[in-house]
């Protein structure tokens, strides 16, 4: 499996993104995607801004299109 360049994706353990739950969407959720949102494409999550990290839970912010997603990753 090829390794993605780390200059734009500073992610130590990409497998945590196999399932990431969106706990907050701003300004409003996309109408074509029912909650809860899940992201399974790891490459699309490159460039996440890590908000906090403690124990085995992390919060990330992801900006895509016009929306700002708050992702909760439960394990690493």
From Swiss-Prot:
Domain of life: Eukaryota
Name under which the protein is recorded: Ovarian cancer-related protein 1
Source species of the chain: Homo sapiens
